[in-house]
Amino acid sequence: MLCSRSSWCGLILLLCWTGSGYLCGGQELPQPVRVLDVMRISADQPPEAGVVTLTPPPLGQGVSCDVLVVGAGTGGVAAALAVAESGHSVCLTEETKWVGGQMTAQGVAALDEDRYIESGGATASYLKVRGAIRAYYQQHYKLSPAAARDKHFNPGNCWVSDLSFEPAAALQAIESMLKPYQSSGLLRIFMRTKAISAARSGNRVTSVLAYNFETDGWTSFRPRYVLDATETGDLLPLAGAEYVPGAEARKETGEPHAADDADPKDSQSFTYTFVLARDSRQEHRIPKPPDYEKRGDAGFYSFSVDYSNGKTLTYRMFERSPGTPGSFWAYRRLVASANFVGRNMPREVSLINWPGNDYCGPALLSKDADQQAQALREAKITSLGFGYWLQNEAPWAPEPATHSRASSGAASGAGAPRDIQAADRRGYPELELVPSVLGSKDGLSQFPYIRESRRVKALKTIREQDISALNQKGTRAIFFPDSVGVGWYPIDIHSCSKGNFSIETRPFQIPLGALVPQGLENLLPAAKNIGTTHISNGAYRLHPVEWAIGEAAGVLVDFAMDHDVTPAVVAGDDRLTEQVQIALVDRGVPIFWYDDVAPETPVFRDAQLLAQRGIFGPNQTDLHFNAGGSVTLAEAVTALARLLGWGAVPSKRAPAENKLALEAITLLAAQGYLPAGPYAPGELGRKLQWSDLQMACAKTGVEAPIDQGEFKPATRGAFAVWLAQLYRRTLGTANPAPSP
């Protein structure tokens, strides 16, 4: 009997192998399958050394959990935490040795963030990781006086990120957050474990079979929900989900920068990062990797970067070239020696994640393990080739005698050996590849930094024009009523077909609909595999956004289980979506863009919900909420009318003559919320006093804040607190408010 996705083919533990042509039901043995083990890929070995041939057993060890999170990267960790914190059981798998993804195993430990990350652009749990990373250095080392005074202490003092660090710091932070749930039994982590197949019954994934590369053991997971948090969307093809690889055509998406024709093989480059230290006492040249001349002689390796806007900048190794933001060394430096004092100082190291070690090859998203292995090996050779070029052929320039340790990165002494100071010298042989920082044997990251995944065909697809500053002329990107998170980063495309390019964006939201696949009930994306396009993914793939995606996915499935509904049902119901948004905001997840309302601020929850529901808060000139500012009478009466669901009052700010505010007053007065007036149009621009709301307080039973005088102007923060109390009382009774 041939196995199909709509049947178990026998016993519940017997698995479906339709994707590989397996037979099940116990009538025939499963056929061998080739499986990629990313940790076995080596530049010194043929690609087949990174592929194992496995024969899945008809029965695997059965493990049941409420939610299976496949992939313990940035999104997977956030999702697992959200589910476990709700009291549901979680199984979390990871094919490398480290949890944390971009922050750890992929080596991108200089966080790609927006400038408001600490004041409104990140979730509370993401900020907790950042705080723990800083604490790691404060606890293990003695900081310099300047670093100790710096509230925003950056261990690496790099110029591309506000927080750069060794992966070990993030690993410790993340593991400490996961540990309580492991101890309680709510969370089980399966390291070096990879999903091999998935079985379906109708539109539900019923089991996922996974293999452990260290124990050779097989596990059959039987969860209620599956979250695909893999770096390349591995569960999507295994589960038969509809997805998009590569680039869409302009006629499909209407995106200005989309190509005329779709190209499934046109994905962004990926990168094996590596870490260098500087030891001026000796040389540390690595062997020339295979096929080095193919890239080296072609000028592939360079300090110059083409920014696709007609501007090319050429950097120097240890000093800043005119017109550049900083030196090559300080670009993604993870530890700056100038930040530390005393004998027990960490070694200064720099992460190398540069166009020179980007690799282009479509095979990474192939279903063929041998093709994937070939691409990964070539990517490793590319990165090692860049390291070789830096040591042997990079343009050399003497450093100024007055250089500082912070700017030069000379952790092992200010000068360089006599032979390196020669005018005709090329390369920096004092640069040392440091494998221990990345936990690998060859000095390269355990997993390549993935910029583009398979992307699920979701209920909502985010397009370039939804977030691009060229299309969105306001202070924020397009408003998504079903927002479950926020992010902000340029559309940053490391293109393999048309050259790298970057598009400015507006601060954007993550719509719930982008997390819900078409045609599947219990499989959700939880990383960079959500409903984006080849282009819009360039802004949604970064650390804090991927974390927010994973956290939202975790909260969504938690809500679905508690209320016995599917995510698709939630996505189609405004009130259910609203309840998910409340759950997110209550745990410190911003869903609306403010740059001055961080999760720890007292007014965070109220400001977020009122703005997202189109009731009160935002303006069209900046990202501020301005909690200490005043509220006009016109703003207050219009907000109250919106909250009560009187759709006759639009969400846009009233015109100068305040006709809309006067209409709101008429409606409110007729229902006993306000005195009948009359109100002169000019009076509506005055500051709101709590005495103006006496009748509304009496009618609703929501009292004004006790610390606010009756005739004192109400602050925006205090008014939001009062209004939010009323909002929570009216949940389920008012009509949905229009968008702000």
Can you say where each PLM-predicted feature lies in the sequence?
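Bacterial N-terminal signal peptides that target proteins for export
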Residues: M1-G10
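Bacterial N-terminal signal peptides
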Residues: C9-G21
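Conserved N-terminal/central alpha/beta ligand/cofactor-binding core
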Residues: P32-V38, H88-S89, E94-T193, S197, ...
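Mature catalytic domains of secreted/periplasmic carbohydrate-active enzymes
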Residues: T74-G75, A84-L127, R134, N212-F221, ...
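N-terminal propeptides
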Residues: L576-P740
